[in-house]
Amino acid sequence: MSAKNNTWVLITGASGGFGEEFARQYAAQGKSLILVARQFSKLDALARELRQHFKVDVMVEQVDLSVMSEVSDLHHRLQELDIQVDILINNAGYGLQVSVQQEPY
């Protein structure tokens, strides 16, 4: 994986839906990808497909974005690899655990 001189796109919620489609679109443009979601198996399958079809660099990061220590760990891994995120697709969903009336805003 070559960190320098690439445009890196970090996509959260990349294991399906809009996130998966964003990954396909950016891979088709030759961008390097960092796919982030909680479901590793789906990310890994998508990454293998994109690498094979588009010949792009793809990192897979299993991260629960509601856990700050996991977000921090991701940040440190990217720093260690000298990867700078150029484009962020902040697509991860947040499901309400309570009714809207009970949700503290």
Segments (PLM) and residue ranges:
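Conserved mid-core segment of classical short-chain dehydrogenase/reductases
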Residues: 95-105
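Flexible cofactor-recognition loop at the NAD(P)H-binding site
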Residues: 16, 93-96
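Rossmann-fold scaffold of SDR-type NAD(P)-dependent oxidoreductases
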Residues: 12, 85-93
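The beta1-alpha1 cofactor-binding region of Rossmann-like NAD(H)/NADP(H)-dependent oxidoreductases
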Residues: 41, 62-73
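Aromatic pocket-lining residues of Rossmann-like dinucleotide-binding sites
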Residues: 26
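Conserved glycine-rich Rossmann-like NAD(P)H-binding loop of the short-chain dehydrogenase/reductase
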Residues: 29-46
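Conserved glycine-rich cofactor-binding loop
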Residues: 8, 15-17
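Flexible N-terminal pre-Rossmann segment of NAD(P)-dependent oxidoreductases
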Residues: 1-10
